[in-house]
Amino acid sequence: LSERVTTFHQQLQQENILKVAPLSHDAIAGFAVGIKETIEELGWQDAALLMLVQPKERNWFDQMGLFAALSQRGVKVVRATLAEVHDRGKLRNGDLWVGPQRIGVVYFRAGYSPGDLPDAESRSARRMMEASSAVLVPEASMQLAGTKKIQQVLAGSGVLSQFVPEAVGEQLKAYFAMMFGLEEEVEGRTAREFLAENAEQYVLKPQREGGGNNVY
């Protein structure tokens, strides 16, 4: 959808309503090329992209733009919910199949919120995908890294040095925002007292990915 906003801004610029020309924005084409190259790298000419969607999908038109770009490049697309993956999916020698179609890449447009995993069947489907040879966008570890508690832990003293050289860790920290947990331990109680006095300078975020669900 952001690509459409860019097109709108370009039109406004042509009509001299905007004085600065917006930068080009080819996210959909870039996405399609990346998926196609990933499947080619796997060496599976018959593999498809599994687009994981919600049962009552609200972003249908957004997804159709991606679907069209992939189809133009010869990439097959299978749209399915977690329940459908559970019912129709299986592992064959470690490869993920949904019905008669082998899956090379799983693109998660669902599965980010607790409501997407309401029962044992949906969680079983997620575990099956994680255990497969398919490329997951994102895999569980990357998805967890998008949650605030994991980000808070990674920002802690001495943690980044376990993954990157200390000098690189110091450079990364320059881009971190200060984060406080609100647990019942001493640190959490101290943080609550501090935040009560400085509430207008902080955002209350739940343990969820993405930029929503915030309290200002």
Which residues make up each language-model segment?
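Domain-scale recognition of functional cores that engage charged ligands
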Residues: S2-Y216
